[in-house]
Design a protein with these regions (language model features):
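Conserved alpha-helical positions within TPR/SEL1-like repeat arrays
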Residues: 16-27, 50-57
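Substrate-gating cap/lid alpha-helix
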Residues: 283-320, 340, 345
Length: 355
């Protein structure tokens, strides 16, 4: 931050410095301050694509409490040039926003726009951003293409906090203990169990906490975190090798910290928490048999630890592994809508566990 302040002292209208400062502040969980400096960046340079996308990625994750941060989607859109709007990242953020708002017609059109984006623009994205865009476009596309019965939108809500998995059953109805609820998603992109287990305060905790404390007290809350931690390249498996720590120990400690964090946040909220475990992984033909087995073992270890610690704190656990597992702990492919996420077909199975 000091470096950016020095740059701004030399050149006060440095839109790039404000944008970079926004990224750093967001990473530190200082969300209000991040929005303020993104706003400054865009005041200097209204069609600055990076700052537009960075503020949008934060704003989408803070639906529907974004008004508390002085951010207005409509005002933010009026100054945009068509060049920014044609960018793949912009269309995917709008796809996620409209899907979160249950505006399926608009979501369809943003997905169509994304798929019509200039492939050159897509190839210029950082690999991480390209994967993000393609994954959300495909996943939400599958959710939109599923059958949507004309069910009444129940007044009672069960809130589903999580990373992309919180979209699996979004805007669907579910019966819990003879009462009907509508499942309402609250997303934190890329959040892992690991993020909640460590001391550091960051955007993952800040966004999740903002949602958690904004819900009416005594709400029913589904929690979906941990699947990213079980992937071969961005969680327990690579961390265990790097830290030279046994996988079991690392998973146990992380899961304990993850559940404890939500227990601590819940002291004043008194929500009914349901920890949703990780579904059986889809066998990935791109990995070796050994790596596939390691992923399956990781999922099993995480789910065991999650059961142990959620029970310790008297929370409920929803076991999606149980009905998604086929041979050797891999997915039976009956409930997955892609290689990672479950879809609405899982709901009757989940309902059975909650009745």
């Amino acid at each position: 931050i000091e470096a950016y302040n020095e740059a701004l002292a030399i050149k006060p209208d440095n839109a790039e410095a404000y944008n970079n400062m926004g990224v750093t502040l967001a990473d530190e969980g200082k969300l209000e301050e991040a929005f303020e400096v993104y706003h400054k960046s865009l005041t200097i340079k209204p069609d600055y694509a990076e700052a537009t996308e960075n503020s949008l990625i934060l704003a989408v994750q803070l639906l529907p409490i974004i008004a508390n941060y002085g951010y207005n989607f409509n005002n933010s859109e009026t100054q945009l040039s068509s060049e920014v709007m044609l960018r793949p990242k912009y269309q995917v953020k709008k796809l996620i926003k409209t899907f979160l708002e249950a505006n399926f017609t608009k979501a369809h059109s943003h997905n169509t726009n994304f798929n019509a984006c200039d492939r050159k623009l897509l190839s210029r994205l950082k690999p991480k951003d390209r994967i993000f865009c393609n994954a959300y476009s495909s996943f939400i596309g599958n959710l939109l293409d599923a059958t949507w019965d004309k069910e009444p939108a129940y007044e009672n809500k069960v809130y589903h906090l999580g990373e992309s998995h919180c979209l699996s059953y979004a805007h669907r109805n579910i019966t819990i203990e003879d009462s009907n609820f509508r499942i309402t998603p609250r997303i934190t992109f890329g959040a892992k169990a690991f993020h909640f287990s460590r001391k550091k305060y960051d955007s993952f905790k800040a966004i999740t906490k903002a949602h958690f404390v904004s819900l009416p007290k005594n709400s029913k809350v589904f929690l979906s975190y941990g699947e990213i931690d079980c992937r071969p390249n961005e969680g327990f498996i690579s961390a265990a090798t790097k830290l030279e720590k046994p996988l079991e120990e690392l998973i146990d400690q992380t899961t304990e910290g993850y559940v404890q964090w939500f227990f601590d946040q819940n002291a004043d909220q008194k929500h009914y928490l349901y920890f949703i475990n990780v579904p059986a992984p889809v066998y990935n033909k791109g990995y070796s048999a050994d790596l596939n087995s390691e992923v399956a073992r990781t999922v099993a270890l995480f789910n065991t630890a999650l059961k142990k610690y959620s029970l310790q704190h008297s929370f409920d656990m929803v076991d999606v592994f149980k009905f998604t597992a086929g041979n050797e702990g891999f997915s039976n492919r009956l409930f997955h809508v892609d290689n990672i996420h479950l879809g609405a077909k899982a709901l009757p199975e989940i309902e059975q566990q909650l009745s």
